[in-house]
Amino acid sequence: MINIAIDAMGGDFGEKPIIEGVLKALETKPFNAILVGNSKILKPLIPKKLEQYIQYEEASEIFSMNGNATDALKNKETTIYKAINLLKEKKVDAVVSAGHSGASMSLATLKLGRLKGISRPAIATLMPNIVNKTLLLDVGANTDCKAENLFQFAIMGEVYAREIMQIQKPRLALLSNGEEECKGNELTKESHQLMKKIPNFIGNAEGRDIFNGEIDVLVCDGFDGNVILKACEGVATAIFQLLKNEVKQSFISKIGALLMKPSFKKLKKHTDWQEYGGAPLLGVNGCVIISHGKSDSRAIKNAIFQAINFSQSHINKFIENELGKYNA
């Protein structure tokens, strides 16, 4: 059975939504949950029927969301430090944390190490498109990148799309300000030349192409990726709020909205980041799923499912093998 360490107290809303997410996941799939935190607080939240799947790793501190990621290695009593350490010692198969993302990245990179051939790890996230989903990476691990970093991100993204998303030949693109090969800054142009070695590389793509269903993996540096991610979250929230405002304007609008309610629910589910759970940190020697600090129980549940799928896929070995083809 898969063993997953869960940073049980690291999110913005404390332990309650995290534990609720763990319990929801256990009701669907059996796994061993190692809850990292204060067991005196956590134990009363666990129903007797699920106690057999729960273990505890004591941690007396929570890494502050206002803390500096560079201090993560010094604070050995924090929940995220203890969780990553369990993975390093191979006592668990994966870690899920909604705590400080910078601390999670820093600890995972320094304590677990990087995969062979990877110079920097990347955070990958799923974005909704009109057909299914687009994998976007990096979305925050590296604000400044070299062309070789983006090439490695491309390989990791392609393998993830193939092994986890079950896309046999994922269409891979590079984010730029135009589709033409000559477009972009020096980093984009240099990265484009490297990515031409990859058979599934289809060239440059613009920001709008994330949503048209014509690409499966989009590669960029962590600065651009994070801006895109946050902008999309804001746009989605604004659109639904505008719809709500318009519906209230007339009786006919309210009737129309009532008739459209099933469609609106499907649309909201498709565009809701909570449905995707968390973002895998690709390139480290282990499975670390980074969840949004504001994750509710549904997001935590889905992040756990991501961790299970990742752990069962042996994706890290596939990434190393794929990179080996180009480094030989």
UniProtKB/Swiss-Prot annotation:
One of its GO terms (cellular component) is cytoplasm. Pfam families: FA_synthesis. One of its GO terms (biological process) is phospholipid biosynthetic process. It is an enzyme of class 2 (transferase). GO terms for molecular function: phosphate:acyl-[acyl carrier protein] acyltransferase activity. Pathway: Lipid metabolism; phospholipid metabolism. It catalyses: a fatty acyl-[ACP] + phosphate = an acyl phosphate + holo-[ACP]. It comes from the Bacteria. NCBIfam families: plsX (TIGR00182). Homodimer. Probably interacts with PlsY. Belongs to the PlsX family. This is Phosphate acyltransferase. It comes from Campylobacter jejuni subsp. jejuni serotype O:2 (strain ATCC 700819 / NCTC 11168). The lineage of its organism: Bacteria, Pseudomonadati, Campylobacterota, Epsilonproteobacteria, Campylobacterales.
